[in-house]
Amino acid sequence: QILTDVLLREPSYVDWLSRPETLEKSKSKAMLMRDFYEMAGKELQSKNIFSTLRKFKKREYVRIGLRDLLGKVEFKETVKDISNLADVCLQAAYDHAGRGLRKKYGAPFYQDANANWKESEFAILGMGKLGGCELNYSSDIDLIYIYTSNQGETRSTDESGSSIRSISNHEYFSKLALEISKSLNEITSE
């Protein structure tokens, strides 16, 4: 029923799904990311990215679901495809949130043990079914956000000397995690 509802609302998917290459094989994360960026086009820099990401996710769910329904794949491949799609949506949400925060606050830096300034790094750990590449159609994703150091602050990496408002690394990464979580809620709100 869900597939039918989506196809009735998005008739252009029927043409896309009728192409042999669409259902032929699974897509790697790199292929999914490329397809998302292709679909996003100029909207990539705007707030409309969530609308595009939601549409992309829905379209790929239909493709994955139809491959599953037609028996073209084993269950293990289906859950891996769903997990890869979740990873790509998560990466796109991270990229979008990071761009916005860096533009406003600069990049986060900390001093290492030798007093050298280094850019702080951030990682998102997928736990449970996402971490095991076992997401199904109705799975929630469990995430843990980690970063290099609470110490330090943001600073401009722009050579033009444009002024930004510096904040602590803790504040920066808290804002980043919150933006990513809000983005994911926005993507799944339909």
PLM regions with names:
Residues 1-190:
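Non-catalytic regulatory/linker segments of enzymes
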